[in-house]
């Protein structure tokens, strides 16, 4: 795994349950604000999608974006996480 992807995955691991961030936000957090597409590619190639929650990263326009298990699964995961978060607070 290259250093760029490691940075992306470390940041994504910090996104709290039930919350989302944008690809642009991730790019800024790793100090590469113009690397939005590269962030998307790194997440597309996430070797551990169950552990590294790439489903919590969405497009800047609010659209859900892609996911290895499909957009419907991504939407369901996000909804489930929001519900769990409400129960925990």
Where in this protein do the model-derived segments appear?
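Nucleic acid-binding interface residues in structured DNA/RNA-binding domains
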Residues: 1-89
């Amino acid at each position: 795994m290259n250093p760029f992807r490691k940075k992306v995955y470390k940041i994504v691991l910090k996104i709290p349950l039930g919350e989302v961030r944008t690809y642009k936000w991730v790019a800024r957090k790793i100090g590469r604000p113009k690397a939005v597409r590269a962030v998307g590619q790194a997440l597309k190639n996430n070797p551990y999608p169950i552990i590294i929650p790439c489903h919590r990263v969405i497009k800047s326009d609010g659209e859900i974006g892609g996911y290895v298990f499909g957009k419907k699964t991504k939407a369901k995961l996000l909804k489930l996480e929001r519900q769990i978060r409400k129960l925990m607070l």
